[in-house]
């Protein structure tokens, strides 16, 4: 199947909401990532909701850390008033935050992560 995508610059693989608690799904995700990494240059992104409780986020990132090194993408920034989890998780995982999403219009609402903008919002500043 990988050969079908050789001519593409980017191929996105979505695990369709696999649960980090389901060992079989985690194993299948690891096999998929391992296969892709053997045949192509790749980057792995762990997509997390900014509205998820911190304790749950910790369990998710711990479960996926055994699968692959990853960058973080946070969704639903427009649906939360607290952004501290972004910083806390970045520090906990040492993974870079690559992108954030602020709405449901794709791709318009996907932004490259801007640390200065996020710190401003964390400190009570307004989003322009």
Write out the residue ranges for each language-model feature.
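Charged helix-capping and loop-helix junction motifs
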Residues: 26-32, 58-62
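Short, surface-exposed amphipathic charged segments that create phosphate/polyanion-binding patches used
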Residues: 2-6, 88, 111-118
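Conserved phosphate-handling catalytic cores of large alpha/beta enzymes
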Residues: 104-128
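Switch II (G3) loop of P-loop NTPases
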Residues: 1-28, 49-50
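Conserved Switch II/interswitch segment of TRAFAC-class P-loop GTPases
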Residues: 18-23, 38-57, 80
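Short, function-defining helix-loop hinge/capping sites that tune catalysis or transport
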Residues: 22, 83-84, 111
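Conserved catalytic network of the ASCE P-loop NTPase/AAA+ motor domain
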Residues: 3-8, 36-41, 64-67
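Conserved beta-strand/loop subsegment of P-loop NTPase cores
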Residues: 13, 41-48, 65-102, 107
């Amino acid at each position: 199947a990988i050969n079908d995508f050789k001519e593409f610059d980017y191929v996105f693989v979505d695990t369709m909401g696999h649960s980090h608690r389901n060992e079989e799904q985690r194993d299948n995700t690891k096999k998929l990532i391992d296969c892709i990494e053997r045949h192509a240059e790749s980057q792995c992104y762990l997509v997390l909701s900014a509205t998820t409780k911190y304790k749950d986020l910790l369990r998710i990132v711990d479960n996926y850390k055994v699968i692959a090194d990853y960058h973080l993408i946070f969704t639903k920034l427009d649906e939360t008033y607290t952004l501290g989890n972004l910083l806390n998780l970045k520090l906990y995982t040492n993974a870079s935050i690559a992108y954030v999403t602020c709405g449901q219009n794709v791709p318009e609402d996907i932004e490259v992560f801007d640390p200065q903008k996020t710190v401003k919002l964390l400190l009570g500043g307004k989003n322009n």
